[in-house]
Amino acid sequence: MSAFRFKQFAVEQDDVAMKVGTDGVLLGAWVDVAGARRILDIGTGTGVIALMMAQRSAAESIVGIDIDSVATARANSNFGLSPWQTRLRACNCPVQQFEAEKFDLIVSNPPYFTDSLLCPDSRRTLARHTTELSLSELDDSVCRLLADGGRFALILPTEQMERYIAQSALRVVRRCDVYSYPGGEIKRVMAELSRGTEAVAQMQSIAIYTENREYSAEYRQITKDFYLKF
């Protein structure tokens, strides 16, 4: 498989369990990066979200962490081939054990297949299932690593997101419901959370496709700085 090419960078992914997908790209394009100087990407995989953060922001330091050593090595390689190599690095470490200065922005496309049969490929299991990182552990780690006034953005299926929001010590400030087609069921939810805010959350929605099975104008608009086809 050749590299997945974006407008300003490419992602090599042959040896990585979880390839570049719609969830990660959509989150990376949607999250608010304004004012973020230090960014953490939990479960960085290929490093695609961290690379998108580097393209979109003026952050001085962007760190991707992953428990898969092969993914971490690949992310560092992808970072080194990018225009922003001095601002990016990947660490092979469970977030529960990760120690660092606080981050202004934390992003994650976390594992969520909690009830399905485990993949026979152990590395895909790590990437796709919550066997090594539960949502409560994720929340504890984010709260520990998030700076005052910082934000946490993630994408999950609806049921898991509602469960996460209900148990989180953080509060939603932005939310976007993601549909495959207009009028269909919600397939994913993106949320941005912060500490102790009393503000009313900004609510959005996006359909990836039109009824004619073409990419929607709103999806094209949000991802146009990245996908070659837009």
Language-model regions: role of each:
Residues 10, 61, 87-89, 171-174:
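Conserved beta-strand segments of alpha/beta enzyme cores
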Residues 26-108, 114-120:
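Conserved SAM/SAH cofactor-binding pocket of Class I
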Residues 27, 109, 138, 193:
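Residue-level signal for inorganic ion chemistry
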Residues 12, 16, 20, 133-186:
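Conserved Class I SAM-dependent methyltransferase catalytic core
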Residues 184-230:
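SAM/dcSAM-binding transferase cores
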Residues 110-137:
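Mobile active-site "lid"/loop adjacent to the S-adenosyl-L-methionine
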